[in-house]
């Protein structure tokens, strides 16, 4: 038992050291701009922009200022994954944290996320969307992954806002159900 506790202590300590040695993401400046009316006037418009702003070829800067206009100021994103033991991990980040962490790889490698199916539930001014996506490194290139974005939106009387977004990628143990496929 004591050996087990010691090994766990080493693993935890080692993880802390590894984390401390990992460089912090470089801050990406995201100037504030006005939203494009066509991006926020309809559910279709805001979801089209949701995918458009993050997609682009290698070397092309992403449209982070435009992206920020889609969300409430304190939006949080939740990325779900499963570790090697099968335990679910939820990584909760702000918009700025998401931009800082994802920008280098998106710009270096290229990334295209495309909606392939949508299920929408609406009550009054509240909407929930399950948006199934495919991911590619090049426009029209091979699909390297799929998943579902779960997006909460609301209408404030003048425009649509995304209040929260969470997603999970398809895996062998987590196939996309047929009702969320085209």
Question: Which residues are covered by each model-predicted region?
Answer:
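Short beta-strand edge/turn micro-motifs at domain boundaries
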Residues: 21-26, 146-175
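N-terminal secretory signal peptides that target proteins for export/translocation
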Residues: 1-2
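Hydrophobic pocket/interface hotspot
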Residues: 50, 67, 75, 129, ...
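Early exported N-terminus immediately downstream of N-terminal targeting peptides
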Residues: 59-60, 64, 68-87
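Surface-exposed, charged secondary-structure patches
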Residues: 76-77, 81-84, 88-142
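Structured segments of extracytoplasmic/periplasmic soluble domains
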Residues: 49-57, 70-78, 101-105
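Short, low-complexity N-terminal intrinsically disordered segments enriched in polar/charged residues
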Residues: 21-69, 180-182
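Bacterial N-terminal signal peptides
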Residues: 5-15
């Amino acid at each position: 038992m004591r050996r087990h506790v010691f090994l766990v202590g080493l693993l935890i300590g080692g993880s802390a050291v590894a984390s401390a040695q990992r460089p912090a993401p470089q801050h990406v400046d995201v100037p504030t701009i006005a939203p494009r009316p066509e991006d926020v006037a309809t559910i279709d418009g805001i979801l089209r922009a949701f995918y458009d702003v993050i997609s682009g070829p290698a070397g092309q800067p992403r449209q982070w200022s435009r992206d920020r206009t889609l969300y409430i100021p304190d939006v949080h994103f939740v990325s779900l994954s499963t570790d090697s033991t099968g335990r679910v991990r939820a990584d909760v980040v702000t918009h700025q944290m998401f931009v800082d962490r994802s920008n280098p790889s998106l710009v270096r490698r290229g990334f295209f996320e495309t909606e392939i199916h949508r299920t929408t539930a609406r009550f009054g001014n509240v909407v929930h969307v399950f948006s199934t996506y495919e991911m590619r490194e090049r426009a029209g290139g091979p699909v390297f992954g799929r998943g579902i974005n779960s997006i909460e939106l609301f209408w404030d009387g003048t425009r649509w806002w995304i209040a929260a977004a969470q997603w999970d990628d398809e895996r062998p143990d987590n196939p996309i159900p047929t009702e969320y496929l085209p």
